Amino acid sequence: METTSANFTQNDSNVCTNLYNHRGWAQYFLPAMYSLICIVGLLGNVLALHVIWPNLKKINSTTLYSANLVVSDILFSLALPLRVVYYARGFDWPMGEGLCKAVALLFYINMYAGVNFMTCLSVDRFIAVVLPLRFSRFRKVQKVRYICGVVWVVVLMQTLPLLSMPMTNIEQSGHITCMEYPNFEKIDNLPVMLIGAVVLGFGIPVITILVCYTALCLKLRHLAKSNKLTEKSGRSSKAIGVICTVILVFVVCYSPYHVDLLQYMIKKLRYDPDCSELHKFQISLHITVCFMNLNSCLDPFIYFFACKGYKKKVLKLLKKQVSMSFSSVVRTSPEGSSKDVFGNDKIQMNSRSFQKERSSVLLNSLEQ
């Protein structure tokens, strides 16, 4: 039986009364973490957008996917202050059902958009380096715009149904919880739905990303072995290092939450977990969701170290700010022509061997 009061839903559950007994440490740890994620994520992604925006006319596939990822991260960061207030109040939401649904919508949009656009980026890099001729048409800007549009439509189809679900619940303690797992427990076939969401929203994308980047690493290792100049320059090693960093960030941020969710849903299909197990799951969810949200503030750092053009433009911007502060002129060398904001170095054809030219082209494609 359910009763409603002041736009909030109250479940008639007197079974579990200890689900938020960890609020003592959570109301300090979670606000601190989310405040850090909000500040770093917002500043980093706004800076990334500031670098990308003036160069939209020179945009290419990599930049376009990255721009969509940046927009998603910014929208998510703007909603985090409300979550900080919620956690600081000890899991108590004072802002109504409507705002709770809006914050939940932005949270899940960011999660699915982040996974999908990271997958698109991995496939884009795979095509650029491993299959540059056969599938190059899928890297044309016009087609990539359509792909981005389809991704957003799919993400909205995945998340908009949340607006029809109750997001808040009045606990026996009087606290009003928002976007907590127990608030969804009365949804029919919830374990099956969430297992399907984990497989489609995380399992398939992570396999795609691992396959694409593994193929990239193998290709780069082959290029380094067949071209001593490339191996000596260290460019292939740097590229492989960047790829490993991207994979590590993705796996560390997204895997704990989805693995945690998957194991508990499988457990629910077998039997009904008791209050102790549900409480442990609640604690693990709060921690793993926090890790997953770290991804939004780590993306700008990946752009900085992975993309030469982005790094150069950020450093130039910082030098400009320093020069203005100290009323001094810092002269920098003019930038060469660039295909896009992430700096696709112009390849100069010369009389060197074909293998060296091919290695340079593929490595430059990876650094876009």
From Swiss-Prot:
Residues 54-73, 124-145, 213-238, 308-368 are cytoplasmic. InterPro entries: GP183-like (IPR047160), GPCR_Rhodpsn (IPR000276), GPCR_Rhodpsn_7TM (IPR017452). One of its GO terms (molecular function) is G protein-coupled receptor activity. The keyword Cell membrane applies. Residues 1-27, 92-101, 165-189, 263-282 are extracellular. GO terms for cellular component: plasma membrane. It is found in: Cell membrane. This is G-protein coupled receptor 183-A.
